Curated annotation (Swiss-Prot):
Protein name, per record: UDP-N-acetylenolpyruvoylglucosamine reductase
Protein family according to the UniProt entry: Belongs to the MurB family.
Native organism taxonomy: Bacteria, Bacillati, Bacillota, Bacilli, Bacillales
Compartments reported by the entry: Cytoplasm
NCBIfam families found in the cross-reference section: murB, PRK13905.1
Principal cellular location given in the protein's record: cytoplasm
Native species: Bacillus velezensis (strain DSM 23117 / BGSC 10A6 / LMG 26770 / FZB42)
Length: 303
C-alpha cells in the first residue's frame, strides 16, 4: 500500500490517511478502519484517484458526511473516498444551483432560504451531504430530491464520470438508479429552485427544524432512520406498538424518542447495531407479519 499512498500524495489529490478509524467519519460514531481514506480537494482529483485505484486494481468506496451509514467493525478494505470540503463548491445561475456532492444539505437549505430561493425547505435539519441526498433520494415533509434535481454528475463503478438527467436517475421512495441498477455516487448536482418570499421560506424551515428537534434524537450519535417505512404504515409506529422503544443490545439502543432510530448509547459496535436491527425485524414479523427493510446503508467487511 505504501507505493499507492505515495502515488496519491504525489498527485496532490487531497488529504490521504492510513488506517483511519471510520468511527471518526460517521454520525453514529461507529466503524472500523479504512486501509486508505482520501478527502479529495477538488472534483478533478476524483478522476486522478480513480486512475490510481484502477491501475492497482484496488476496491474503492465513497462516503459523504457519514449519516445514513453503518460501517462494520472490520472496516473497509482498499480506498475510501470521502466527499467533503474539496467538493463543496456552489454556483448560482438564476433559479438553478450547481452544488458539489460534499456540500452540507442543511447548509445549502439555509443559504438558499436567505436568498429567497425555495425548494429545499424539506431539507431543513436533514444531516448529510448533497451527494448522499441524491444517492438515496432523501426527503421529508412530503418532498424529496427528485422534485428539484435537474441533473447529477455521477462517478460509476468502472471509474467513468457522466451526467444523468432527473429521468435517468430513476427516482422512487428513498432510492435511485445509483443503488442497484447503475451503482455510482454523485459528485455534483444541478438543482431547480424558485423565488418566493424569504419570510415564508424561513418560517417553513423553522417549523421543519422544530419538528425534527422535538421528535428525533439527533442530540445522540445516530445514523438517521434505520428502516424504510412499510407503507401505508410507519416504521417508528410499528416499533413503538411492539414495545421496542428503549430496547438495548450492547451499546446500541432503540431511541425512546423515535422508534425508527437506533442510537449509540456508549461504546456501541456495528455488531450491536446489526443484532438490534435483526431483533426488531424478527419481533415486527412475528407480531404484525410485516417485513422491515433497512434504509441505513451498511458497508464494510465482506459486503
Amino acid at each position: 500500500m505504501e507505493n499507492v499512498i505515495q502515488e496519491l500524495r504525489d498527485r496532490e489529490v487531497g488529504k490521504v490517511l492510513e488506517q483511519e478509524p471510520l468511527a471518526n467519519h460517521t454520525t453514529m460514531k461507529i466503524g472500523g478502519p479504512a486501509d486508505i481514506l482520501i478527502i479529495p480537494n477538488r472534483v478533478e482529483a476524483v478522476k486522478d484517484i480513480m486512475d490510481i485505484v484502477k491501475k492497482h486494481d484496488l476496491p474503492w468506496t465513497v462516503i459523504g458526511r457519514g449519516s445514513n451509514l453503518l460501517v462494520l467493525d472490520e472496516g473497509i478494505r482498499g480506498v475510501v473516498i470521502k466527499l467533503g470540503a474539496g467538493l463543496d463548491h456552489l454556483e448560482i445561475d438564476g433559479d438553478q444551483v450547481t452544488v458539489g456532492g460534499g456540500y452540507s444539505v442543511v447548509r445549502l437549505a439555509t443559504s438558499m432560504s436567505k436568498k429567497g430561493m425555495s425548494g429545499l425547505e424539506f431539507a431543513a435539519g436533514i444531516p448529510g451531504s448533497i451527494g448522499g441526498a441524491v444517492y438515496m433520494n432523501a426527503g421529508a415533509h412530503g418532498s424529496d430530491m427528485s422534485e428539484i434535481l435537474v441533473k447529477a454528475r455521477i462517478l460509476f463503478e468502472d471509474g467513468t464520470i457522466e451526467w444523468l438527467t432527473n429521468e435517468e436517475m430513476d427516482f422512487s421512495y428513498r432510492t435511485s438508479v445509483l443503488q442497484k441498477k447503475r451503482p455510482g455516487v454523485c459528485l455534483e448536482a444541478v438543482l431547480q429552485l424558485e423565488q418566493k418570499e424569504r419570510e415564508a421560506i424561513t418560517a417553513q424551515m423553522q417549523q421543519n427544524k422544530d419538528y425534527r428537534k422535538n421528535t428525533q434524537p439527533y442530540s445522540s450519535p445516530c445514523a438517521g432512520s434505520i428502516f424504510r417505512n412499510p407503507l401505508p404504515d410507519h416504521a417508528g409506529n410499528l416499533v413503538e406498538k411492539a414495545g421496542l422503544k428503549g430496547h438495548q443490545i450492547g451499546g446500541a439502543k432503540v431511541s425512546e424518542m423515535h422508534g425508527n432510530f437506533i442510537v449509540n448509547a456508549g461504546g456501541a459496535t456495528a455488531k450491536d447495531v446489526l443484532d438490534l436491527i435483526e431483533y426488531v425485524k424478527k419481533t415486527i414479523r412475528e407480531q404484525y407479519d410485516v417485513d422491515m427493510h433497512t434504509e441505513v446503508e451498511i458497508i464494510g467487511g465482506n459486503r
